[in-house]
Amino acid sequence: MKKIAKKTIFVLFVLFAVGMTFTGCSKEAADTVKIGGIFPLSGNVAVFGTECRNGVEMAISEINAAGGVNGKMLELIAEDDEGSPEKSVNAYKKLVTRDKCNIIIGSLTSGCTAAITSLAQAQKVLLLAPAATQVDITDAGDYVFRACFIDPFQGTVGGKFSLETLGAKNAAVLYDIQNDYSIGLYENFKVAFEQGGGTLVAEESYSTGDKDFNAQLTKIKTTNPDVVYLPDYYGTVALIAKQLRAQGINAPIVGADGWDGIIDNAGDEVLNGFYSNHYAADDSTDEKVVTFVNSYREKFGSTPVSFAALGYDCVYLLRDAMVAADSVDAAVLKEQLTKTDGSYVTGNLTFDEKRNPVKPAVMLEIVKDGDKLTPVYKATVNP
């Protein structure tokens, strides 16, 4: 009987200990809101992914330091998709299945984000894309939002700016025929520029990974364009700009938010260059922007590009929705997000019926400041 009693006591003790363990886990889980993050932290656009993750982390740190959201702490679980759609899917599945995230910020590029939108919609996971500008990203359904403006708007901005601010009458375009981002920008630049009375005198293309653009640039040079539109990411644009200037093409070059970071990857060849962006970091007087930029510089030792600001805004969009709805449930938050009407680092923001943000774009000019390049505010273009 004593042996039975001892065994009984031991079993009860074990059950009690296990129960306490699970109670602790449950309490910890209940006090924490997991936010999944999918970013290209390595690969060709790693600088963008790292900046975006930094912005997300900084916002979460600020919110947690202020007491969290409705008494809950936010936790980022970040995954690297290397800029690969296939790896984006793997990262998404890991975050949802293993980490039990029902809110995800990501991915960064349009191709990687498009690979996971249908999964998120089917599984009722709230997906907030910080920088995927491809127009059909949110077509997957009402669980998919984005914080950035879309390619049609960016392309239109480039066309209007070239006509109205630069006074261009004709333009040449050199774009990546294998990249949806580049194609979308080119197509919408063309529409806006031609509808505004301009003429496209050259439309040349290349393939992803190409390094030599001299053949296309030779054709462009013969047309003597007033402006050259380069809708691609900073690494490729830096290569094109160097070859373009070497050929004696001195026309202004214009691009989009994929240029962000170009000043660290190019030289004087990108002077007389202009690009659309989500905010002006260096010379803004907006209190939210100034505070964000100063905090980022203090934390990371560098000036934040727009992808950091977009990641930062994603977290505050979610925070505001959580507070207003008094919920962290994805189904509730998606409804609350549609009611957004607030001021953020990248501008005053509401969502349209496709869950795309309605907000202005700024055009930045690359200038020489002493011995370094810097982007400065040039113009604002409203929706």
Regions found by a protein language model. Give the residues of each.
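Extracellular/periplasmic bilobed ligand-binding domains
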Residues: 186-277
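Segments of small-molecule ligand-sensing domains
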Residues: 298-308, 319-373
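Beta-alpha junction/loop-to-helix N-cap segments that form part of ligand/metal-binding clefts
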Residues: 27-29, 47-52, 66-138, 206-213, ...
